[in-house]
């Protein structure tokens, strides 16, 4: 009798353990479109990029409900994911990897422009380094101007090695976190360069890649390209780093139309006088302070942001490239200090 009870207990523990195991997967397409509902017509919530590890928490037909590191919970199709066991995920995470640094590219079957395309790539995608011997990176993994890479599902192919760098350890800055001493001036310049490379990319609600970006997606992908993880949304990005004062007249009780009408060059220059290159600039409701937009300050009264498309605009009324909603500036934060 005791043996039977013991066997039952062991069986129950085994079933419980199996039931509690998380279903994990890795994004295997250049961009994974995460939608509000399991339907192609459903709203795009965000994108995740190749090489990102996600958790599967639901299933409906060929749709998988996933939780990404952003964190976001939404639906993606099974073909954009490679499901892995816990052991496979551990092995994947330990493997040496490349970060794809160009705005856009391809993986081909052979190291030549005539090679058949296996998949496209966008900046921020992560690819495994091809290893021929255990623990050693193969010197034959590079072929002239080409590098051999491995996709999450194990397929291998070739892309330009100039567009790759070894993936470094990433800094995760969450809302409320200080970033003091974590980001230097050189890194911030690289963030700005990444943003400039995306100029002209169309605005896409929920987008976070060279295929389309929204305002906070632009900020997140440019920092991610430089091994810094920021929150996905502007309302959380504003809570990172060090707050910088926006010095402007009290607008309490005034309508947005009144604020816009009274916003002049002197008020604008005074509002941004404390900003330095690389600061994040936030816009929204001047009375409530709610955040609806973000850009990266470039200095000289200009910022780069995603509005209609990725573009550079002035924050000073009267300038030729003046941003029409600059009067809605409400907050700013500094990540490099």
Task: Report each predicted region and the residues it spans.
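Loop/turn positions that initiate beta-strands
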Residues: 51, 122-127, 278
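Active-site nucleophilic cysteine motif
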Residues: 195, 207-226, 230-233
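Sec-dependent N-terminal signal peptides
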Residues: 4-13
